[in-house]
Amino acid sequence: MNGLQEVCSSSGSVMIGLPAEEDENAAHSSEDSSCPDESVSETELDLALGLSIGRRKVRSSLSSSSSSLTRESGTKRSADSSPAAASNATRQVAVGWPPLRTYRINSLVNQAKSLATEGGLSSGIQKETTKSVVVAAKNDDACFIKSSRTSMLVKVTMDGVIIGRKVDLNALDSYAALEKTLDLMFFQIPSPVTRSNTQGYKTIKETCTSKLLDGSSEYIITYQDKDGDWMLVGDVPWQMFLGSVTRLRIMKTSIGAGVGK
């Protein structure tokens, strides 16, 4: 059509005085514009689908990241809690571990008892030894003191003999023993003692008889008392004689005839 045409589209828009080509273009544009709702709806659908897919991706990424964070935090917590657990376990193991068995405890107790017993025995033995040593020392000292106190050495001289001698009066118990001792010292001097003459010396010692006390001999025994007076041996009891004698002398009878008178 060469004239003006009126075209009414579905949208109600009117186009006047357009040529045919323009009319076709207008028809196409009208068709395109006749379905704006469908294009919009498709676009919205695409957008909605894209958004939903994006949201799902975001949610999945968020969930994966959160799960990874949760795992990491759990790993860190487990790693942090493992030293504490290990320390607690170490403490629990260190205290009272390994346990002592009954036989070991008994052996330790018996060993301690044996050591204590040995120590007590050794200390007791040491105490007894010390005590015995002290007692022995005391006894030795007592014997030494007793011997030093009780030994009563008295000098004895004889007329005509230059060398004097000493006799222990406490070793004797009577005048007869003193007489025999002086007789052996001055009158019956044995030869040097050997195996051959030992028996002879014993025989002389046992069988020798003296008459120094009865006055029938050439010599008599006198003593000097604490006052310096000379007296005849045998005129007083033996114990009194021991308490007063200071010196002994064997005199000739002719010289000592007036002694003690």
UniProtKB/Swiss-Prot annotation:
Q: Which UniProt keywords apply?
A: Auxin signaling pathway, Nucleus, Repressor, Transcription, Transcription regulation
Q: Which GO terms describe its molecular function?
A: DNA-binding transcription factor activity; identical protein binding; transcription cis-regulatory region binding
Instruction: List compositional bias (Low complexity) regions by residue number.
Output: 80-89
Q: Which domain of life is it from?
A: Eukaryota
Where do the segments described as Disordered lie? 1-43, 62-90
- Summary of the tissues where the protein is detected: Preferentially expressed in vegetative organs.
**GO CC term (a single one):** nucleus
Q: What is known of its domains?
A: The N-terminal half of the protein contains two conserved domains I and II. Domain I includes a slightly degenerated ERF-associated amphiphilic repression (EAR) motif which seems to be involved in the activity of transcriptional repression. Domain II is required for the correct degradation of the protein through the SCF-mediated ubiquitin-proteasome pathway. Interactions between Aux/IAA proteins and auxin response factors (ARFs) occur through their C-terminal dimerization domains III and IV.
Purpose of the protein:
Aux/IAA proteins are short-lived transcriptional factors that function as repressors of early auxin response genes at low auxin concentrations. Repression is thought to result from the interaction with auxin response factors (ARFs), proteins that bind to the auxin-responsive promoter element (AuxRE). Formation of heterodimers with ARF proteins may alter their ability to modulate early auxin response genes expression.
The subunit structure is: Homodimers and heterodimers.
Similarity-based family: Belongs to the Aux/IAA family.
From the Swiss-Prot or TrEMBL record, give the protein name. Auxin-responsive protein IAA10
Write down the species: Arabidopsis thaliana (Mouse-ear cress)
Q: Which gene encodes it?
A: IAA10
